[in-house]
Amino acid sequence: VGWLRNLGVFLHQEALAEKAVVQEMDKLFAFAGKVKKITQGKRCVVCIGRMLMYFHPAGILETLSRLEMQVEAIILFDNYNPKERKLMVEAVSAQCQAPIIDQTAGQQLLETVDLVLTTHEITNNQDIKQIFLPMLPLVGTSGEIEFMDCIYKTLCRRGEKGGIVYV
């Protein structure tokens, strides 16, 4: 919604832009309210293997918070150089209090959570429910609602069967 406010400033229509922001936020909270009966309290892990210049975790973490999901950990895959790892740790820490752990430390955790959101397919474990986070995220209110719906539907799938869903 930041872009709406910026557009309002550019067009000298701040009040109108703020009205649009409120409408968009109402849509997000209304949808989140519908699916929270399933998402609330569910345990998840976010696995990240992309550099910060290609993946910004803030939107994902904000959506998980809106759905009242419990982020057990952020797992950073082993493909980071020290500089890129530091940048991602700073970006994640600014948004989330969950522990940030490496791939090895997170292996067992993957099997105990309700959902794994990941930038890279985890192919060595077919039992976990995964949502693949694309390079280009869905945008806008409709994009976030589509992402929340994907989380909801993945959590609603019957049984313990894993698999991967592409947003």
Task: State each model region's role.
Residues V1-V167:
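An N-terminal assembly and electron-transfer interface module characteristic of large anaerobic redox
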